[in-house]
Regions:
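Hydrophobic alpha-helical membrane-insertion segments
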Residues: 44-57, 150
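Membrane-interface helix-entry/capping residues at the boundaries of transmembrane alpha-helices
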Residues: 36-40
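Alpha-helical transmembrane segments of integral membrane proteins
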Residues: 2-35, 51, 64, 78-173
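Residue-level signal for discrete positions within transmembrane alpha-helices
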Residues: 1, 5, 41-44, 48
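Extracellular/periplasmic helix-loop junction at the C-terminal end of a transmembrane helix
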Residues: 51-79
Length: 173
């Protein structure tokens, strides 16, 4: 049904946006550093791996071997909210992996652009630390583009969750 698909798409977009903000800001703060190289490599891999294959691998590893998540099925939100989150977490993580490549690049470039603005020089003159200035000013200025891209990707996810829903036996579209 559509509500399950929408819930999964919103959950996956929120996860992708949170992870991409952390990795994108860390990459932009030290271009060419370890975090930058690792995150760029991971986003290339995440974009290249088919979602249904990643779903099967994650299901075998995290659900069957480790038992962290249910292997398949869905618990309605009205019946058990915690069970619903638990049943949608692994599919949302798999869907988020496909979206991370674009979002990390968008966050990284937006933050790097914001770090070059003149108001960053003013924050140094005021005596603010780079981390404080980044959290206070840079994030506010640079998150509009990633949020816009995430909204567009969420619309794409609503139509593209069919294979993942089938692998995880979710009653979606």
């Amino acid at each position: 049904t559509l509500p399950v698909t929408l819930l999964l798409a919103v959950y996956a977009t929120a996860v992708a946006l949170a992870v991409s903000c952390v990795l994108g800001v860390a990459s932009a703060m030290r271009p060419g550093g370890v975090v930058d190289v690792v995150s760029r490599t991971l986003m290339q891999l995440a974009s290249a791996v088919p979602g249904f294959w990643l779903a099967v691998v994650c299901m075998l590893f995290f659900a069957a071997n480790l038992g962290w998540f249910p292997v398949s099925g869905y618990v309605p939100l009205t019946q058990d909210p915690a069970g619903c989150v638990r049943s949608l977490t692994l599919p949302a993580l798999v869907l988020a992996c496909g979206e991370l490549g674009v979002l990390i690049r968008t966050v990284r470039s937006s933050v790097m652009d914001a770090l070059q603005q003149e108001y960053m020089l003013a924050t140094q003159v005021k005596g603010l630390t780079r981390m404080h200035a980044t959290v206070t000013y840079v994030l506010r200025a640079s998150l509009s583009a990633p949020i816009t891209v995430a909204g567009i990707q969420m619309a794409k996810l609503v139509g593209g969750t069919g294979a993942i829903e089938r692998v995880f036996a979710l009653p979606g579209l």
